[in-house]
């Protein structure tokens, strides 16, 4: 085995591509490394097309092996299971830029498998997997119009940073991944701390320029190690069939695409499609329905795109930069902590915010270690939202991806844990959908968070842009419909505040999208975002001053860290009894910060008083109220503050001589006692003699407390 190796510098890192030694039965296999993070990527392509296949069956799998980080998986089975949310998102990140580079009509099945086999905690494997997938596809000989490059761009001290390390990323105001060919950008995925449109565009251009070194290196690698390119030829169009479909459907489809209501339009189009299939198959039974449907869909695209390029009104009658009618309601669910319904045309999101305590944080076990997530965002897309029936179950790749995009849009305005000590979960239920439900989720989430009293830094809105480009002519569309997304050349989603952008996602289906076109799209998106924010601010101008009556209120107090063990008790007995008896939730940090969550403020104050008693220092000479816990021949044991036991010797029970302790005291009896001394071993000697007559001399353990809402 003689592996072929290509090594090159990429920013501050060294990238190595190796092939020829492992997985030699795959169509292509590449071991891609960036410093010590290594991802093994394979491509298998079937030479034959399944009979009746009418779509491109590309599958991308990304999997992380725990051995890559020198770990053994947790759980009962001690092996990796179903893909995590992070693995699913990276699989989508690989898929999105490579899918448009396969030619139209190519229906051979292809599977890309990326396996993380070694990980340097400072180098994220996602970029390595993208580069490895690009290299493997380029070597495989399949009709792939790549290679692509991939770059991560950070923004630190007003400077763009190429492929920042994990440590550098913590200081960055931007996390942007851009992928593209030598000619054009194909995909952008980003999260930003409120940057301007100009800064976002500059970061995309910077990343695309820098990744050219990757593209050139893969081309050189393919010259040495690549397989012969397949002699695949695109199927010739059936002009007779195209003309037949046009003759039957063109005029009727033109009329159907003037119906503004989605369901009525779809019913009309489905009826036309069924009629076309029936007429043509009646004449020639050998013609497959799939071919007829492909031509029918192409005709739809031609009609819609032609009208947009010609400057005619869009499908629903709008101009290119008009946002659909908005309708907003907040506080729609009576017992939730915060809720809102955001409706934009025929797209609607019900967003609900829930406040929880630190113990509700999600523990995420990654290759680089465990971390806690205090802001959770979940997006649900049920089939009824598009008037269909279907399976209801665990979230699919699309739902996970849309949820993460919406979360990215809102994350920049969330308060820190120190400012607002709650774990926050937002759920977006898409109840209607006709384009850009992820951006409706951003708007709905912002409204629900404000309704819940979460002190977000600013309202956030999102908008989806589209593009139709024919040769040199192009039109940028604001607030695209589902059909415009499907039939257009670009899906461009922007979320942000009045001050700037918080998230940008872009998927481009064609080459030739210039920075100028992207700048027009960003400017048009900003105008639409300002319009939406204006309507949102009328509905709820600022976060509510108080949280919901049904949300837990968190009260904080400080104790001596040395006393934490006393509050917890043996085996957690003390803290468990406190929570069970008061109905509160108690969290204690290592620095002695105690956070008590309770819906009832009296319960919180009660438990705080009891904690104060537990941690209180017993003072010699002080008088306490205590409870007799047990009797002995030589005296009685009395529990005082914090259940600390002291001994009242038989000689200290009364002024007169005591013959029998039980004649004076009973278990459970409350008595006043005075601390005589605390010896070196911490034992407490008590007396019931020589007590001051007035109750006011007793130690009061109540201190003022701080409430955080």
Curated annotation (Swiss-Prot):
Record bears the keyword Magnesium: yes
One GO term (biological process): RNA processing
Protein localization: Cytoplasm
UniProt KW S-adenosyl-L-methionine keyword: no
EC primary class: transferase
Domain KH, first and last residues per copy: 552-611
CDD domains to which the protein is assigned, alphabetical: KH-I_PNPase (cd02393), RNase_PH_PNPase_1 (cd11363), RNase_PH_PNPase_2 (cd11364), S1_PNPase (cd04472)
A Pfam family of this chain: RNase_PH_C
Recorded coiled-coil stretches: none
HAMAP family from the UniProt entry: PNPase
Protein name per its UniProtKB record: Polyribonucleotide nucleotidyltransferase
Organism (species): Haemophilus influenzae (strain PittEE)
